[in-house]
């Protein structure tokens, strides 16, 4: 909240404009495609990971996972990947707004093919 209190009205207006441009671009991209990306910036952190490691993972994941919310688009994560060192990782599918059921059907097909 402290950081938000420092944002000026001009900065907020500029940010809203950037968000609107990004939303339009993402929706155009997703109109006839599904975005496929990792569900997180890396694999699951170790149980004994430091707070700094966990925060870095969270921040990296937030940068990637905000795309669906920014576009108002459905997304689903599938626990079907592993990192090179064997840690669990997910695959995220992002579809166009309004394609929720199609996206779930695709996720189901992918999950079935990796079982």
For each predicted feature, which ranges?
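Structural helix-boundary/capping segments
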Residues: 13, 70-115
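Serine-dependent amide/ester hydrolase catalytic core
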Residues: 1-70
């Amino acid at each position: 909240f402290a950081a938000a209190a420092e944002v000026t009205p001009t900065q907020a207006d500029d940010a809203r404009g950037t968000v609107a441009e990004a939303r339009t671009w993402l929706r155009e991209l997703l109109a006839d495609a599904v975005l496929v990306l990792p569900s997180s910036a890396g694999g699951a952190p170790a149980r004994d990971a430091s707070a700094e490691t966990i925060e870095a993972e969270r921040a990296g994941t937030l940068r990637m996972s905000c795309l669906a919310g920014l576009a108002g688009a459905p997304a689903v994560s599938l626990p079907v990947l592993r990192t090179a060192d064997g840690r669990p990782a997910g695959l995220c599918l992002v579809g166009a707004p309004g394609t929720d059921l199609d996206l779930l059907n695709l996720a189901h097909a992918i999950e079935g093919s990796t079982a």
